[in-house]
Amino acid sequence: MIKRYTRPAMGEIWSEDAKFRNWVTVEAAALRAKAAAGEFAATIPDQLESLVAVVAEEVDRLEREKTRHDMKAFLELTASQLPAELQPYWHDRMTSYDTEDTALGLQLRSSVQEIRKTLTGFMAALKTRALEHKYTPQIGRTHLVHAEPITFGVKLANWYAECFRHFVRLDYLEQRVSVGKLSGAVGMFTLDPEIEARTCESLGLKPVIATQIVSRDII
């Protein structure tokens, strides 16, 4: 994203550091799901995510100098920070896009929520001004020429109605993008589907049918 054209909140959602934090969130959720399914008995710290520090520059350095693969660099950096008894299960039987696309679902959901938050403020301003100018006259126009008189408040109320429809669309879009997958490299489940279901539920996502990646028609 080009910084000068990006709102700060949206820039934070799509920053490299935020991306890797979301990867940690997904990996931690999958680890807990595996434990809940009885795959191992080791204790998982309640604040596991806060124990794993990941900095984009360090991941990039490892990728450039050693792994030649962003996920391998991420896993090398993060697994080493886990208790030894948990390390074998971190990313176990998962493919890169189990982590990346599930994290993408978190980013997309946050983005829709941020857009809706901004739209809510804009709609409140439109409503205030529409009522304020309820009786403020202006000329109506058709085909860019003067027509019958209207009020400026009516014009603003029309814009408010359009924004309300956009608001409804954003609600639907949030549901559509809030998906994840842990179905492996070709969608045939190297992990029990119950682990995918548990992981997604803990993240507020819904499992989606996928191959290696989640189809981009969700956007």
Regions found by a protein language model. Give the residues of each.
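Amphipathic, heptad-repeat alpha-helical segments used for oligomerization and assembly
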Residues: 206-219
